[in-house]
């Protein structure tokens, strides 16, 4: 059984800490800062950091990699098509990574960056997805390198995963994302209920993650481009009809960028 905890970093990043409590082994996902990880290891003597999983090259995801590798000897996994510091294993779509007794499938997720990857496993009691900055709770990453078509395809690929899949994204953006979701679907009861629940969580200084694929299908406008009401709002924003789901996505993303 793997336990997963969030190590907060910077203003809104989460470094995900995977723990094999029976064997005192652990792994981290996207350590943008080494300090929170080293602090945790310092409080847990006898634990071994054996793997570092990286989704993409942005500094707030890789800034702590080299120091952690130097301190612990952990093996570093990351996308083949991006420059990842201290990377040992370069990963492409369809690869499989074995970490803490779980086999993670590597999914290419171009959009936020061109080489972005996600890690997915169905081997745990509940399927797990580490989506980096591709799929957020109620949102998605900005398009720094890829096209709207690429990002839409990446998100649709994630939306097809089992609905019970737990989604561990890299930032606490949920509340602001839900404000946008309410603008897109103002009459959606699931969106409103989620907004109220997350508002309370954040007021209590609790994190809003993980989400699930099922919740995202209901409340994330970027996964709901096939819905007529979502298309209508996208058309209103652009001032013309968006003929494809990818163009609906592009309209939503451009709207969110200035929301």
UniProtKB/Swiss-Prot annotation:
CC cofactor: Zn(2+)
Amino-acid positions noted as binding Zn(2+) 1 in the UniProt annotation, renumbered to this chain: 56, 58, 112, 133
Molecular-function GO terms, alphabetical: hydroxyacylglutathione hydrolase activity; metal ion binding
Top-level taxon in the UniProt lineage: Bacteria
Keywords: Hydrolase, Metal-binding, Zinc
Residues the entry annotates as binding Zn(2+) 2: 60-61, 133, 171
This enzyme's EC code(s): 3.1.2.6
NCBIfam families for this protein: GSH_gloB (TIGR03413)
Biological role: Thiolesterase that catalyzes the hydrolysis of S-D-lactoyl-glutathione to form glutathione and D-lactic acid.
HAMAP family tied to this protein: Glyoxalase_2
Name the record gives this protein: Hydroxyacylglutathione hydrolase
Species assigned in the record: Pseudomonas entomophila (strain L48)
Lineage of the organism: Bacteria, Pseudomonadati, Pseudomonadota, Gammaproteobacteria, Pseudomonadales
Name of encoding gene: gloB
């Amino acid at each position: 059984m793997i336990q997963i905890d969030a190590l907060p970093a910077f203003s809104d990043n989460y470094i995900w800490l995977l723990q094999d409590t029976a064997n005192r082994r652990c792994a981290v996902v996207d350590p943008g800062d080494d300090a929170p990880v080293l602090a945790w290891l310092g409080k847990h003597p006898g634990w071994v950091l054996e793997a570092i999983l990286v989704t993409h090259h942005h500094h707030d995801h890789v800034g702590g990699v080299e120091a952690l590798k130097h301190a612990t000897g952990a093996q570093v996994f990351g996308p083949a098509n991006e420059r990842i510091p201290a990377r040992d294993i370069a990963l492409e779509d369809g690869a499989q990574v074995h970490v803490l007794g779980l086999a993670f499938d590597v999914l290419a997720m171009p959009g936020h960056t061109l080489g972005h990857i996600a890690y997915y496993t169905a081997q745990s009691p509940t399927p797990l997805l580490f989506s980096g900055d591709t799929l957020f709770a109620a949102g998605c990453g900005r398009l720094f390198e890829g096209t709207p078509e690429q990002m839409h395809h990446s998100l649709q690929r994630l939306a097809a995963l089992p609905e019970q899949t737990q989604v561990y994204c890299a930032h606490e953006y949920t509340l602001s994302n839900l404000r946008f979701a309410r603008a897109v679907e103002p009459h959606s009861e699931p969106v409103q209920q989620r907004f109220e629940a997350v508002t309370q969580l954040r007021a209590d200084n609790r994190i809003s993650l993980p989400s699930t694929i099922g919740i995202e299908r209901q409340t994330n406008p970027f996964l709901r481009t096939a819905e007529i009401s979502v298309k209508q709002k996208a058309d209103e924003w652009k001032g013309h009809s968006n003929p494809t789901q990818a163009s609906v996505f592009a309209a939503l993303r451009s709207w969110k960028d200035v929301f």
